[in-house]
Design a protein with these regions (language model features):
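N-terminal Rossmann-like NAD(P)+-binding domain of SDR-like oxidoreductases, especially those catalyzing
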Residues: 1-181, 306, 314, 320-342
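Residues that form or flank phosphate/diphosphate-binding pockets in enzymes
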Residues: 16, 43, 68, 186, ...
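Generic recognition of short, well-ordered alpha-helical segments
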Residues: 19, 46, 71-72, 91-94, ...
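C-terminal substrate-binding subdomain of Rossmann-fold SDR/epimerase-dehydratase oxidoreductases
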Residues: 20, 62, 79, 193, ...
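A glycine/serine/threonine-rich, flexible loop-to-helix segment
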Residues: 51, 137, 188-196, 273
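Short beta-loop-alpha junction of Rossmann-like oxidoreductase domains
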Residues: 133-135, 184-186, 190, 288
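Hydrophobic alpha-helix immediately C-terminal to the catalytic Tyr-X-X-X-Lys motif of short-chain
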Residues: 157, 161, 165, 195, ...
Length: 342
C-alpha cells in the first residue's frame, strides 16, 4: 500500500474530481491537496467551497497546458491525479481542437512534470469510450483502443502519451477507465442531469434516436472509491483498470426512472436526431478492479433517487449554469428527429 503526503489533483473542481477531493478530505485528512483547475464552463469553484480556508487544502486557478505553472506545483507534491479534461462527446463534435489541446497536450505537460520531479505515481483518469463501440462481450484492459469521437480519441491520445512516458522514462503510471458516472455536482449537459433538471422545469427530456443506446452507470461515490483504491493499492506492473458496475442500462430506462421518481408524465420524453458516430453500447469487464477489492455499493436505482433529490434540493447550484451559452449549445445539439420522406 502506498501513502502520500501531498497530492496535486488536476481538474479537481469538476464533477468527478471534486467528489474525489471530498472523499480524500473525509477519509484521508492527513494528505495535503492542491487542486489545479482552469474553471472552464464545467469546472465550478462552488463544488469545493466547503474546503476554502481549511488546513491541508489549496486551490490554484490555472491550465494544465501551462508548463511553468504545472512544474512549480509538481515540485511540491508526491503524485498527480489527473481529472482535467474536456469530457463531453457532444461538444467534441462542435469544438474538437479544444479536446485535443487539453486531453493530449495537457496530459503530456503533467507527465513531464511528474517525470522531472520523480513522482511516486501519475494516475490518469480515462474513460471506457476509448474502446469504442462494443456490440458483443465486454471490453478488457488489454483490448485495442478504437475511439470514434474527437473526445474518446483525445482521451486515447492522452493515454498513449502517458504509456510512452512509462516505457521511455519509467514514469510510475496508473490509468482508470470509468463507465458513465452520475451523481451530485455534475454539469447539466450529461444525460442524467439533463433529464433531471428538464423534468424539474417540465421541459422535454431529450433522448437520441430511439433511446436504446446502452451504458453502464456507476455512482460517483463508487467511482471515486475505486480511483482511491487504485491510487493506493494497485500494482504498477499492469497499470490499467476498468471501473464499472457490469449492469447495462439504456436511455429509455434512465428517462422513465427519472420521471417515475419525480411523478412526471412519460409524455415528457422527446426523441431527437442522433449524434454522428454515436456508439450504441459500452460494456466493461471489471474483473481486475473487483479482484483488487472494490465493488459498487450504490445501485443504479438508489443512486438515481439520491441524485434526483440532490438536484431538487440544490437549484442554487445548477440554475445559474443553465445560462445563455448553455441554451445556445443545447439548441445546436438537440435537433428534432426527422424521418425520411416517402
Amino acid at each position: 500500500m502506498r501513502s502520500f503526503k501531498r497530492l496535486l489533483v488536476a481538474g479537481g473542481a469538476g464533477f468527478i474530481g471534486s467528489n474525489f477531493v471530498r472523499l480524500l478530505r473525509s477519509t484521508r485528512p492527513q494528505i495535503e491537496i492542491t487542486v489545479l483547475d482552469k474553471l472552464t464552463y464545467a469546472g465550478n469553484p462552488a463544488n469545493l467551497a466547503e474546503f476554502e480556508g481549511t488546513g491541508g487544502y489549496r486551490f490554484v486557478h490555472g491550465d494544465i497546458c501551462d508548463g511553468k505553472l504545472v512544474d512549480s506545483l509538481a515540485a511540491g507534491v508526491d503524485a498527480i491525479v489527473n481529472f482535467a479534461a474536456e469530457t463531453h462527446v457532444d461538444r467534441s463534435l462542435l469544438e474538437p481542437l479544444a479536446f485535443i489541446d487539453t486531453d493530449v497536450r495537457g496530459t503530456a505537460v503533467l507527465c513531464e512534470a511528474a517525470r522531472k520531479h520523480s513522482h511516486r505515481v501519475f494516475l490518469l483518469i480515462s474513460t471506457d469510450e476509448v474502446y469504442g463501440e462494443v456490440r458483443e462481450g465486454r471490453s478488457r484492459e488489454g483490448d485495442a483502443l478504437k475511439p470514434r469521437s474527437p473526445y474518446s480519441a483525445s482521451k486515447a491520445g492522452g493515454e498513449h502519451i502517458a504509456h510512452a512516458y512509462a516505457e521511455s522514462f519509467g514514469l510510475p503510471l496508473l490509468v482508470t477507465r470509468g463507465s458513465n458516472t452520475f451523481g451530485p455536482y455534475q454539469y447539466p449537459e450529461k444525460l442524467v442531469p439533463v433529464l433531471i433538471t428538464n423534468a424539474i422545469d417540465n421541459l422535454p427530456l431529450p433522448l437520441y434516436n430511439d433511446g436504446s443506446a446502452v451504458r453502464d452507470y456507476v455512482h460517483v461515490e463508487d467511482h471515486c472509491r475505486a480511483i482511491d483504491l487504485v491510487l493506493h493499492d494497485a500494482p504498477l506492473a499492469d497499470p490499467v483498470y476498468n471501473i464499472g458496475t457490469g449492469v447495462e442500462t439504456d436511455g429509455n430506462h434512465v428517462a422513465n426512472a427519472v420521471l417515475e421518481i419525480m411523478g412526471k408524465p412519460k409524455s415528457l420524453i422527446q426523441y431527437v436526431a442522433d449524434r454522428p458516430g454515436h456508439d450504441y453500447r459500452y460494456a466493461l469487464d471489471v474483473t481486475r478492479i473487483t479482484d483488487l477489492g472494490w465493488e459498487p455499493r450504490v445501485t443504479f436505482e438508489e443512486g438515481l433517487e439520491r441524485t434526483v433529490r440532490w438536484y431538487v434540493d440544490h437549484p442554487d447550484w445548477w440554475r445559474p449554469l443553465r445560462s445563455g451559452e448553455y441554451w445556445d449549445y443545447y439548441k445546436r445539439n438537440y435537433r428534432p428527429l426527422t424521418t425520411p420522406s416517402s
